[in-house]
Swiss-Prot record:
Pfam families the UniProt entry points to: YgfZ_barrel
Annotated protein name in UniProt: tRNA-modifying protein YgfZ
PANTHER family the record matches: TRANSFERASE CAF17, MITOCHONDRIAL-RELATED
A GO biological process held by the record: iron-sulfur cluster assembly
Family: Belongs to the tRNA-modifying YgfZ family.
InterPro entries, sorted: GcvT/YgfZ_C, tRNA-modifying_YgfZ, YgfZ/GcvT, YgfZ/GcvT_CS, YgfZ_barrel
Amino acid sequence: MAYHTPFAAQPPVASSGLPLTLISLDDWALVTLTGADRVKYLQGQVTADIDALSADQHVLCAHCDAKGKMWSNLRLFYRGEGLAFIERRSLLDNQLSELKKYAVFSKVVIAPQPDAVLIGVAGSQAKTALAEIFTELPSAEHPVTQMGNSTLLHFSLPAERFLLVTDTEQAQQLVEKLAGRAQFNDSKQWLALDIEAGFPIIDAANSAQFIPQATNIQALNGISFTKGCYTGQEMVARAKYRGANKRALYWLAGNASRVPAAGEDLEWQLGENWRRTGTVLSAIQLNDGTVWVQAVLNNDLAADSVLRVRDDALGTLAIQPLPYSLAEDK
């Protein structure tokens, strides 16, 4: 089987019913940071403590403006001799221009890597399949491994899955090795798994709209409140210590006559009426017709609240439990 991306699109499947699947992640992009000041520079730009990040760990953190609003969130890790991060391709150019603003004063090179290949490996037997190709696999305890030009990231949520950062040659080998027993899908399958995991999706429509806590990044250990200064730190700290944050990320599931776009609002049922509320971050329709929506809503919303896609008289959405706790933020 010849390697080319994106893989043909199939309706996404929930993690509980997902067979072994290779997923082309063309909707995400890779950026690298190299140079003597790479750690110091990034430490002043993102919410995570980069000084404390070890080579076998990855972290989801935020890159904010001076008001604490996220330009984007970043899946950050070490790769080769430098740092790397993965973010949504839709906001890559704008986010990079913001990140590079002060780089001229530091020994750091920040560069997109358009030739890098990003592939998700998920579903039943994902670990077993990868073990036939890689001699060392990442785990929950050590979620990043490096082998040659390849970096493997492990995710425990919503179920065990892996993200491979590699080159075309290694990707070709993976596809050939697993072609007989794996199915293939495009970025929407990984998007569905991220929604199920409660990992916030920030696309261009929602860039510079939310503080990190409005998307649960603090619950995913993506904010350090003890590190030194970084852009937007004052507003992020205020949200924690003064209770300024009134929003949270939710996973909704149900029926809808259409899949809402990022940036749309939803409607919340109040008696016989519907009130507009919240902001859609991402949405997907599964193979069984169910619609999943990831949205930022008021964080005091009752668990049994009924919502719907805007002006959709035929559908309703219910709040689903996230696989992590927000208790420490209340």
